[in-house]
Amino acid sequence: MARTQRNTDRERTRITDDNGVAIESALVGDGLELSYPSSDGPVVECTRLDIPEEAVTALVGPNGSGKSTLLKALSSHLEPDTGTVRIHGENLDSFSQKELARELGVLSQENDSLGSISVEDLVYHGRYPHRGFFDGTDEADHRAVERAIELAGIDEIRDTELGQLSGGQKQLAWIAMVLAQDTDVLLLDEPTTFLDVHHQFRVLETIRQLNEEKGVTVAVILHDIAQAARFADYLVAMHDGELYDWGPPEEVVTEQLLADVFGIEAVVEYEPELQVLPKRALPDR
Amino acid sequence: MAEAESVGGYAATEQRDSWVTGTLVLFCLASTVVTVVAGLIQVSFGEYSMTFLQAWKAVFNPTVIFDLNAWVSFLFGTERPDMSTNSIVVWNLRLPRVFVGIITGATLAVSGAIFQAVTRNELASPFILGVSSGAGFAVLATLVVFSGLAPFLPLIAALGGTLAFGVVYAIAWKGGTSPVRLVLAGVIVNMVFQSLQQGLFFFADDLGVVQTAIAWITGSLTGTGWEEVRIAILPALISIGIALAGARQLNVLMLGENTARSLGMRVERVRFFLSGVAILAASVAIAVAGVVSFFGLVVPHIVRNTVGGDYRRLMVGCVFAGPALMVTADVGARLAMGGTQMPVGVVTGLIGGPYFLYLMRKQQSMGEL
């Protein structure tokens, strides 16, 4: 299992695996200051953010802590005021939009409801960055789409129109679309929110399978800290637009963190496995 | 297992290429039949009286159809080879009007369909986004104030439309545009141009000028001939060709701005480019037929209700349905009132409006594209 070794000033941590070999980061945010045109002052300030290669990183934090904003900056949907984002060591700006879409798949939190499109057609749109203006679909496209549909387990609804699906099935269809993009890095903004438990697990299992089989790097915003603690390899905890802590869940998830960041009193059990048992909301928030 | 999978893959391959559904084929065939029938009715009536048989014989007269010189004269304005009086009346006076109807119908429908996807708005059409009112104002200003420029009317109409849409885009632009801002800006610009139009009427001292102007602003195919076909055919073919090729871009755009960007589309650029194509298409129609109301709004809805929301199908459907409806409406405009001809825009407005309301009542999901 990975461990973090903290420097004395606690500014910069370096992740190593069991043999002490440093793990590369797929995505790095450096000296980021993020704001929206309508906001006064930066919404997110973050000296350094690492999304480790071939691992699942969960971004957690309360509403308005800046998770989505950070994800937007990582996916080039939001231009940082200062700082840079690098993917596999290269600056995001050096990619054309299509080149980037072949490296980095993004699923936004809100997907506009589009009723009259079949699931299969939607998944085929995931091949957009791999096709030219006049290109038809080729064999590689078909393979990627079949694989994505199989991974997401939505073969039986492939011909159904999106408008007739439940929220969970819709989400799986959108995820299949991003999977068909066939990228090494995947950013997902709250893919499990509003889903029933069954579909939450199906979404998470799909992500996990993708990570284990294809070595895809995943950064995912999760609403539920207990779920994130069990599911992710690394946690990034956000609080008031700043990084509160990050590292493997065993180290990050403490009763102190739950009080400071989420404003809840909770019991954290580390044996036999990490478990968060929320008790009640703390009064002073 | 691997074999079974790859077989499944091939089956899917075949399926993919056939986005052309039976409904679409049937719809296009039906539209073609309607266009032909309406066209035949159109050429059979007129001041020079002919029997149906005579008129149709003239239409399908092989000595004209297979005469290269005749086509050269039609399309390039060279001297007409000798032909019978019937042929001249049909081929030179009545058929070109049908062709202009076909061209304007197709371009307006395609233009409306593109605008609806680009703005992701049900109500979008060349109208809403200012193109029509801008063109209408330019025409009116030319007729009333700069009457010397009248020969360049089509060009001026197109310029006016482009200018108005440019203004709309500039107003809506704020580090990027959004569908809602585009439509709001369009409504405002529309209003301003319409006020300007109404203001201009007060400066027209000649009743004839006013009538010409009104015909332009309501849209009319009266008096159109090969001249108009020559003006319109090339830009129409270009814009329709690009629209058909860009159908997949429109499909991706329909997924929403964020998703389209995540998939690697340069959303602003594609949106601007396709809007340009839609303006070109609308300008073609406006240049030869004036501002035919409601058409660009209603036709895409009719097609969407029949063949579904996939733009690959929708575009093809529009290219067929637009001509069918325009030629039919023009038959009504020319022949319904006996002696006097109405502008075709009056007919499309009168039929299109109620039909649109009917669709709205019938379809539960009208709010969604």
Show the residue positions of the predicted features.
Chain A
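Helix-to-loop junction immediately C-terminal to a conserved catalytic motif
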Residues: 75
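ABC ATPase nucleotide-binding domains
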Residues: 259-285
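ABC ATPase C-loop
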Residues: 178-179
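Conserved ABC ATPase "signature" region
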Residues: 124, 139-157
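Conserved ABC transporter NBD signature motif
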Residues: 83-91, 100
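Catalytic Walker B motif of ABC-type/P-loop ATPase nucleotide-binding domains
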Residues: 186-190
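The feature captures the beta-strand-to-loop junction immediately N-terminal to the Walker
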Residues: 60-62
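A short, flexible loop at the N-terminus of ABC-type nucleotide-binding domains that lies
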Residues: 11-29, 33-53, 58, 91-96
